[in-house]
Regions:
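A compositional/biophysical signature of low hydrophobicity enriched in polar/charged and small residues
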Residues: 1-115
């Protein structure tokens, strides 16, 4: 019964894929940060996304409303590594005018939508 239900949900497109959940800290990535990225031209965001995809530390990117053109989640080994990623990679992308960084202190809720 469970196998049939999972098959039905998968065929309907509700389940996109099965993934592993990694413990970033056990891999040495102790800093989780969210970065609001200000863009010179929001119309260039697809090109910027392609460049962000090449940065291994970036795990999510969202094109958003509000102050930021993009909101990015990344993992780094520590704050020094974070600074190197921000200054040496993200801020060097053409049309990124500035960033605002939020360091996550804890992640008390992690879940998918219930259905």
């Amino acid at each position: 019964a469970i196998h049939q239900r999972i098959g039905k949900i998968k065929r309907s497109g509700i389940i996109k894929e099965f993934t592993l959940s990694l413990d970033e800290k056990k891999l040495g990535y102790n800093t989780c940060a969210f970065v609001g990225v200000f863009l010179d031209k929001n119309s260039q965001y697809t090109e910027i996304i392609e460049k962000l995809k090449r940065i291994d530390e970036v795990v999510e990117a969202h094109y958003t409303t509000g102050e930021y053109g993009l909101f990015v989640k990344l993992y780094t080994k520590d704050n020094d590594h974070l600074m190197k990623v921000l200054n040496g990679k993200i801020k060097k992308i053409k049309d990124v005018t500035r960033t605002e960084t939020f360091i996550s202190l804890e992640e008390p809720i992690t879940r998918n939508i219930s259905f």
